[in-house]
Amino acid sequence: MPQNVILPGPAPWGFRLSGGIDFNQPLIITRITPGSKASTANLCPGDIIVAINGLSTENMTHNDAQERIKAAAHQLSLRIERAETKLWSPQVSEDGKANPYKINLEAEPQEFKPIGTAHNRRAQPFVAAANIDDKRQVVSSSYNSPIGLYSSGNIQDALHGQLRSLIPNASQNDPAPAAVPQSDVYRMLHSNQEEPSQPRQSGSFKVLQNLVSEEDGRPVGTRSVKAPVTKIPTGLPGAQKVPQCDKCGSGILGTVVKARDKYRHPECFVCSDCNLNLKQKGYFFVEGQLYCEAHARARMRPPEGYEAVTVYPKC
C-alpha cells in the first residue's frame, strides 16, 4: 500500500538506497541510521521508493535517484510501498460459510509462588510420610553407607531424633535401648579400644627373625650395619677426549678445523699477523705459526739461487 513520507531538511537523511533501472531492481531502502530523520519518519529497511519529490522512479537509475535526493534542500518527499505482514490462520467453515479462526491472546492467570517457599531451607534430610495417622516417617538417606544403616532400628532412631524437636513429649515415648549382644567379635573390638596393646608382628616375620638369630648367634632384633660408601666416578678407558685449540688452549665442541695435526676453532683459524680468517683460503706454517700467503712470503726468504713457489695442499 503506497504511503507518503516527508522528511524535513536539510540533509543528512539517514538511509541507504540500493537498486535502480540499471540494476533491473526497484529502489529499495536497505539501511536506516538509528536516531536519524528517516528513523523518526518510521522508514524501514525493505521499503520500495515509488516516487521522489513527485517524480516516478520507474525509469530512474541509481545515480539519478541519488541526485534527486541530494537536490532536495528544504524537505524530501518520498512515496513508498511497504509489504504487508500477514499472519496465517486456518479457515473454519460453519454451515458452508468460511469464517476466520479466532485466537484468544489473553494471558491465563497463574498462581504466584515466591521463590524459596517450597524448598527445604535448613540442612535437613527430606522425608516421605509412610503413615500420616501414626506420624511415622521413613528417612531416605543418600549417603554411601553399609546396608546396616538402613535397618528398621536405625530408621526408627532417626525418626525419634526428629520428633524430639517437633513434639515436646516425644522423649517420654522413647523405647528402652536394646541389650548389647556380648559376642566374641564385640568383646574383641571393645577390648582393643579400651586397652592399648603392643605392636604385633606377623607369623612369617617371626620365623625369619628366629632363623637369622640362630645362625648368627646374636640376640633377636640386632644386626651389624655398615655405612654406605660413595664411589668416586672414574673416567671410562675408551672415552674420547675433547680436542684442544692450538691457539686459545680451550676445548673444542662442535666444528673443528685441523691443519698439520693441530686443531683450532673456526674463529681461531686466522693469520697470526692480520687476523684474517684462513678458512676456504690458503694458509702457511712458518716456525709453527699460521700465516696468510702475504705475511708468509714476508717471513720466508729462500736461500740464494732458489725461488719461492706456492704449493697448495691436495683436497
Swiss-Prot record:
One annotated GO biological process: actin cytoskeleton organization
Domain LIM zinc-binding: from-to ranges: 243-302
A single cellular component GO annotation: Z disc
Domain of life the protein comes from: Eukaryota
Tissue-specific expression: Isoform 1 is expressed in heart and in tissues enriched in smooth muscle including arteries, stomach, gizzard, intestine, and lung. Isoform 2 is skeletal muscle-specific. Isoform 1 and isoform 2 are up-regulated during myogenic differentiation.
Physiological role: May play a role in the organization of actin filament arrays within muscle cells.
Name by which UniProt lists this protein: PDZ and LIM domain protein 3
Lineage summary: Eukaryota, Metazoa, Chordata, Craniata, Vertebrata
Gene field: PDLIM3
